[in-house]
Amino acid sequence: MKRLFLAIVAVIVAFTAVDAKPKQLKPWSKGTLDIHHISTGRGSTIFYILPDGTRLLVDAGDLGDPSRWTHKEIMPAVPNGDKTPAEWIARYIEHFSKPLDKELYLDYAMISHFDADHYGKLDKTAITVEGKPYKYTGMTHLANLIPIHTLIDRGYPNYDYPTAEAFRKRNGKLFFNYYELVKEREAKGLKMEQFKVGSDKQFALKSDAAAYPSFRIQNVAGNGNIWTGKGNETRSVIGPKAPQGAALNENSSSCVFRLEYGNFSYYMGGDISGFYSKKKNNYWLDVQTPVSKVIGTVDVAVADHHGYRDSMNDALLKALNANAIVLPVWDLYHPHPSTMKRINKQGVTEVFPAGMTAENLAKLTDQGLADAIRPAGHIVVRVLNGGKKYQIFVLNDRSLDYEIIYKSKVFTARGNK
């Protein structure tokens, strides 16, 4: 109880670092890059407003019925449980899209990989809708709240990694629910694409690309393949010496990319793993190490696999050398103490949780691992026009006013290497 009290006090003290009168984030303006790590308490979602106003969403998680956890294992749904995660995500996107002064839609939406906390859960919370061949949950729900011009995932159109049979067995009914949305989009002539490993053109700016030539998203890994670092060239993550039948699991099949704007750079790697069983010698499950060889340094990184024990191995942390790390977390087990030890050892000074249970914060505080952890909430990385400076804001995820509860110093972006 004492640890929990101290952790809560630490959060309250951090809140007071911002002016006593709550302030809202200044509206997006042309030339600014905003990256919103949305906290719902029920899964991962990242919303990007790119410098010309192009909009990208990565994931729309929904863990479904929370009753299978104890109250201490998972944080409350935020801002509350009155709406589904997809409805709260849609409201957030609508709110922060107002400065664009145009129709509400997403130019791109991508599912990093096929796990419930990234694209929905098929249980009693999934919504049956008359006339629809699929239930609404996560991305299938969001796609019916906000039009998506191009929907991207790791497997379209064949969904056959590691094999078609293994893919379907692994992902089951939840995938087939999503696949009905895919077929509906195809019938309507709406764009579907596979994440193109090696490409830096897939997420092109849609409104005024010529004005921002330094902006690009480099697709690094996904669906069993990885960029070599040369042109659009790719190779299999699993080398030729691996035993026959060796394959990545769903997490390590995640889509991975590097975003650049001016001198600023940012890493997103889904749930790829950085560890493997030495007893089984299944070394190919460590995707972080090969990624570390081509990714380059960044200013801000999203922790892979929510900061779990297999997240952010030493090779990747050293290669990224990030100033700040964002943690998409919501339960007692993420981030894991071993991961926080590695992050602290690397010298990362600011760690931003998009959600956090008070119990886990207390545990990490008690172990001396929470010094770099900032208040939890919606985490917004704002990159100023031209990409030379950036600042990180924490917005209140319990409020529909999205007040600023913490703000970092203004960082100087370090340049792309």
PLM segments and residue spans:
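Sec-dependent signal peptide recognition
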Residues: K2-I8
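Histidine-anchored nucleotide/phosphate-binding helix
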Residues: I46, M139-L142, A315-L317
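Zn-dependent metallo-beta-lactamase
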Residues: D19-L57, G61-P76, Q218-I226
